[in-house]
Design a protein with these regions (language model features):
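Phosphate-binding/switch region of NTP-binding enzymes
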Residues: 158-222
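Phosphate-binding/switch loop-helix module in NTP-utilizing enzymes
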Residues: 86-154
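Conserved P-loop
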Residues: 24-93
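Structural recognition of the conserved hydrophobic beta-strand(s) that form the central parallel beta-sheet
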Residues: 50, 122-126, 154-165
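Pre-Walker A adenine-sensing motif
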Residues: 1-12
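NTP-binding/hydrolysis catalytic cores, primarily Walker-type P-loop NTPases
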Residues: 2, 15, 97-101, 107-121, ...
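Conserved nucleotide-binding/hydrolysis micro-motifs of P-loop NTPases
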Residues: 54-58, 81-85, 128-131, 165-169, ...
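Short hydrophobic/aromatic beta-strand immediately N-terminal to the Walker A/P-loop
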Residues: 18-22
């Protein structure tokens, strides 16, 4: 896994789990998920899928390479920008039937499950906010999210869902994701001795012994490293 992450987690995270990776813009949420999936799969006979709703797969691959994270045959980046474009075209020509993205993600999981079987173990969804923006606002949304999280667990996956959080720490979304999720990993910035330091903090992780302290992280061309607990001032 990511060097130094054993300072935060005392034991392995067993699947199935749905883990929210939250933080303000620019807090390296995408990089963290990339690094974690890539380093985890390196020594495993397993498969991972990175599903992006916001950027193209090509853009993500370029970002990974610039971070020093190599895309392996055990990992695929899938984008849904084509489907979004189809939706917009339908809107212009007057077809009101919109793609059900929750159902689309479920079908995508089933397709990779057929190909890889139980070796398909890790999924990243980038991001929950983008998923909401693609769904029509309705009173059914909370129920749909409950079903969505359950479906991810039923597929025996460790799923990391990226979720934007404002600088004040408040989630800008529906508010029940934290309750539904098995884990919450917060990425942020803290001022230490006049310098801004990136940190990682596990706010919650069911069935896993972990530190709740903020841990400094460093991102270089060779990847991400967890340095150790932040000094409290």
């Amino acid at each position: 896994s990511i060097p130094g992450l054993d300072k935060v987690f005392k034991n392995d995270i067993e699947r199935p789990k749905v883990i929210l990776v939250t933080g303000p813009p620019g807090s390296m949420k995408t990089s963290f998920c990339y690094s974690l999936m890539s380093s985890y799969l390196r020594d495993k006979n397993e498969f991972g899928l990175y599903a992006t709703l916001e950027e193209t797969a090509e853009s993500h691959m370029h970002n990974m390479e610039s971070m020093g994270v190599k895309l392996s045959a055990k990992m695929q980046i899938s984008d849904m920008t084509d489907l979004r474009e189809i939706d917009q075209i339908d809107e212009v020509i007057g077809d009101s039937a919109q793609t059900d993205y929750v159902l689309f993600i479920e079908k995508m999981i089933q397709r990779f499950r057929r190909t890889h079987g139980d070796k398909f173990s890790v999924l990243v969804i980038d991001s929950l906010g983008a998923l909401y923006s693609l769904m029509s606002e309705s009173a059914e949304m909370r129920k749909k999210m409950f079903y969505f999280f359950k479906m991810l667990r039923d597929n025996n996956l460790t799923t990391f869902i990226i979720m934007e959080r404002s600088l004040t720490g408040e989630s800008q979304l529906l508010g029940n994701e934290g309750f539904l999720a098995d884990g919450i990993v917060m990425l942020g910035l803290d001022r230490q001795r006049g310098k801004l330091v990136r940190y990682l903090q596990v706010e919650k992780m069911r069935a896993s012994e972990h530190s709740m302290e903020k841990h400094a992280i460093e991102v270089t061309k060779s990847g991400m490293t967890v340095l150790g607990p932040l000094l409290t001032t």
